[in-house]
Amino acid sequence: MNILELSEQEVVRRNSLEQLRNLGIDPYPAAEYTVNAYSTEIKRNFNGDENAAKRQVSIAGRIMSRRIMGKATFMELQDAEGRIQIYITRDDICPGEDKEFYNTVVKKCTDIGDFIGVKGYVFRTQMGEISVHVQEMTFLSKAIRPLPVVKEKDGEVFDGFTDSEQRYRQRYVDLVVNSHVKDIFLKRTMVFNSMRSFFNERGYIEVDTPVLQSIPGGAAARPFITHHNALDIPLYLRIANELYLKRLIVGGFDGVYEFSRNFRNEGMDRTHNPEFTAMEIYVAYKDYNWMMNFTEQMLERICMDVLGTTQVKVGEKLIDFKAPYRRVTMIEAIHEHTGIDISGMNEAELRQVCDKLGVEHNETMGKGKLIDEIFGEKCEKNYIQPTFITDYPKEMSPLTKEHRTNPELTERFELMVNGKELANAYSELNDPIDQRERFEEQLKLSEKGDDEAMYIDNDFIRALEYGMPPTSGMGIGMDRLVMLLTGQESIQEVLLFPQMKPEKVAPRDTKEKFAVCGIPEEWVPVLHKAGYLTVQSMREDKPGKVMQQLMDINKKYKLGLAGLNLETVSAWQEAPYE
């Protein structure tokens, strides 16, 4: 890499790297480093008895701060559990006559961000801080790019690494310098573990189903399309795993579940990412009433396991996941929040309702989609506390069993929390003839231009023809659940690496474009270092200023370039250029 492409700190760190190697120290050793203690455990188990034997420990971590005080140095080491202060003295680390390790390696070649391993004993400093008195230090990894320096005093953070776009793009840095971010993802793991335990205790089986599918079924969503070269067929990234899990119920499993990575080629916002994690579970011989009870019990259990309480604060709202939850039919919900009873309305009447309420709609939308739009625009945001919205119109639910008392409706519920859908569940449709008719209705919607209409999956219908027992299924958005339980209002905060727009890069002319103006190739990196990334930007400054900046960089970095004068720079600026 050209030295001019590096910051001053990066140059210093690379020089330190070279110095370590010259001293015979491998800055990236391959050997295992044995760790027998962690920061939080050391502090928790510290024995303050002055007469007790000093505890010997071996710890490793990243240097997060350092203070050099002549013959002594204090550093703060960050490991997987937290931070602890270490204390290094010249004569302890270098007991003989040769003090070079302390004077050169410790004082000059270590930087914030480096990984080191230290061995020593635990003690309490005169200031009362539990620390490790270092007797041996090993370099484990040299950081050649500086971390953002986040300062904290009296609980207040200064110079924080807080820009959202930077944090999401460089999550590895975010996790290092913002300790609360790691806590979010530790809680995420706890949520998954708690849910998995809840299912396993009841005898349900975790399974894996295909991510690449020939038919993107199980949900109304736009898929990502790819191509299998060997088979020469189009394939789709999974939008849902529902139809495969139901095939397993046909095959004789009483209860199956899967945590699946799903992909939907749709918009991104604070609650949607094109790649997300869902959990779907299907249990034979149950219905949606049973599943409502099961779902609220599950969520109450998860909250207690992860938080120790059922109450969660999201912004200014306090949400309580303690069962039971309120139950409201879709028709009742729309009537409650619009004053309009839509039961029995046809498509034309629903379009009039949309017009009256100011809900956008178009010709591709059928009856179910229109109702969905009304509910989404006028009702959904009002359900802050966990609420089951039940009994959806048949047109909205092509995979759901017809309601046992009203043929216009289906046995479906969605769990609304904080104004958003968290879970979706049915009494599953197991009539193969009815299922085919529902798929054909979806095909008609697709022909009208609805790109979220479901595909016909003939193999799934064939599976139903062999017989599927009465079954209830439930899907839950795991990312949204983690958002709720960690008090986050953006899905990007609970995804380690959320999808991002391409990173913006400043326009930069090539060496060939600079050459058109007579600028030698060796001067182009110098111009870039001076901030002149394009010929046009160079032309906008006075030739004297450009020349002075180039000469300063040439001298500072000892580049040894010659032949620069005011006349030359003026000629560069005046040369014809297109």
Curated annotation (Swiss-Prot):
**UniProt main location, coarse:** cytoplasm
Q: Which residues bind Mg(2+) 2?
A: 421
Using the chain's own numbering, where are the disulfide bonds?
none
Q: Which reaction does it catalyse?
A: tRNA(Lys) + L-lysine + ATP = L-lysyl-tRNA(Lys) + AMP + diphosphate
Looking at the keywords, is Lipid metabolism present? no
One GO CC term on file: cytosol
Name the CDD domains for this protein. LysRS_core (cd00775), LysRS_N (cd04322)
Task: Quote the cofactor binding remark.
Answer: Binds 3 Mg(2+) ions per subunit.
Protein localization: Cytoplasm
The Gene Ontology terms for molecular function here are: ATP binding; lysine-tRNA ligase activity; magnesium ion binding; tRNA binding
One Pfam family for this entry, by name? tRNA_anti-codon
Keywords tagged on the record = Aminoacyl-tRNA synthetase, ATP-binding, Cytoplasm, Ligase, Magnesium, Metal-binding, Nucleotide-binding, Protein biosynthesis
Tell me which EC number(s) this protein carries: 6.1.1.6
Binding annotation for Mg(2+) 1: 414, 421
Q: Which InterPro entries match?
A: Aa-tRNA-synt_II, aa-tRNA-synth_II, aa-tRNA-synth_II/BPL/LPL, Lys-tRNA-ligase_II, Lys-tRNA-ligase_II_N, Lys-tRNA-synth_II_C, NA-bd_OB-fold, NA-bd_OB_tRNA
The record's SUPFAM superfamilies line, in alphabetical order, gives: Class II aaRS and biotin synthetases, Nucleic acid-binding proteins
Instruction: Report the superkingdom from the record.
Output: Bacteria
GO biological process annotations for this chain's record? Answer: lysyl-tRNA aminoacylation
Q: Which cofactor does it need?
A: Mg(2+)
Q: Which family does it belong to?
A: Belongs to the class-II aminoacyl-tRNA synthetase family.
Subunit:
Homodimer.
The protein depicted here goes by the name Lysine--tRNA ligase
Query: From what organism does this protein derive?
Result: Porphyromonas gingivalis (strain ATCC 33277 / DSM 20709 / CIP 103683 / JCM 12257 / NCTC 11834 / 2561)
